Amino acid sequence: MNFTAPAFVLLFPIVLALHWMLPPSRRWVLLLTASLGFYAVGSPQALPLLAGITLGTYAAALGIAKSKTQTAKKLWLTCAAVLCIGCLCLFKYAGIFRTDVPLLLPAGISFYTFQTLSYVIDIYRGRLMPERHPGYYALFVSFFPQLVAGPIERSTALLPQLHAQERRMDSSGWLWMVRGFAKKLLLADTAAVFVDSVYASPTDASGPAVLLATLLFAGQIYWDFSGYSDIAVGAAALLGVRLSRNFDHPYRADSLRDFWRRWHISLTRWFTDYVYIPLGGSRRGTVRLAVNTMVVFLLSGLWHGAALHFVVWGGVHGALLLLEKALTPCGGKHKAHTWTAVCLRHAYTFSLVCIAWVFFRAASVSDALLLLSRLPVDWSLSTLHTTLLSIGIQPVAELVLGALCLHLLPETSSAAPSPRSVLAFCLLALTVVAAWFSTLHTGTTNAFIYFQF
């Protein structure tokens, strides 16, 4: 379900009102019905697969809990892993080998397969007891705010909240949702117009155009993905459920290691807990640490898509992270804190992240290398002037207005709002509504980037 689609915008307030009108013991029925309904609107053909993985992992978890021997438990775990990873590989990567058999990628499959698999693994490790109520487990898998693009929630965090009878609406959800819609409609979709034009024709791009497109895409993917996460967090908060925060100002990072603590936090934690640490983490020497790091980042790239340029993006991050670790004494514990040193670290981190984004956004590795090779090309004043004019006055105004209002918004609604923040919220909300109606009128609604993963 696309959060900017009319169906969600019109039906979510109805679901919200009904949710708080129902007795607590019946709310799960409404939420499960709404979750499956929202999913069916966007991907009706994928509903049986979602149901199959839900039933399969539910049975596997119960099987592990009932098994008396370790062999039987491993068999149940293996069945769940084959089900989740097998379905993910079939629908996401089968096209690499059989281009004559087109398979539509089910919405959210990369997210809910990881979420259900981590649940079964935690049962196997003895960290929690299985959820025996099939309805609550189905809701855990399909909870609509985070089903399609995360955050990837742990059962220990989400299931108790779904069971809770005394949930309360968190009004900060409105703030989160307005912020998320603003990031998507005012910033991400606006930046996408110029970015798409440059990446569509890399051979014709000038140096200024490549640089500007690279910077704008860094903003676009952050605004787009964090915008979705903000809407998800906000919608869940209004339903009395607290989701994990997926982003923590990643472009404020002063190292690549710091960047990955702040970017797509739920996925980073998943790979850390279920791949990196089981492989040995950093406990088995330098060589093993390097191998484990590269495995995690290559898998992360592959998770994003069945294309070489995604794998290269992951490999670039893994290699740069290892190089940074090797060149940083004492793990970076003794950093210089002068203004110049701090600025240099931020600039270095942002520059490397932006270079890696070129591989992520380009249609192929060759296109990415071509775009990077054109960075030094044609930096004349006339080309620079033409590039800036090609963006247009209206998009620039939307970017500036949206960014300014977002900056003035408070992080949360816990503190007493200032007149400035109230004005920013009202202005941003009105602008978002206008932008939403504009997209409906022009038919230019863009899906969130991470829907394709």
State where each predicted segment sits.
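Membrane-embedded transmembrane alpha-helical bundles that form the catalytic cores
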Residues: 1-402, 406, 410, 414-452
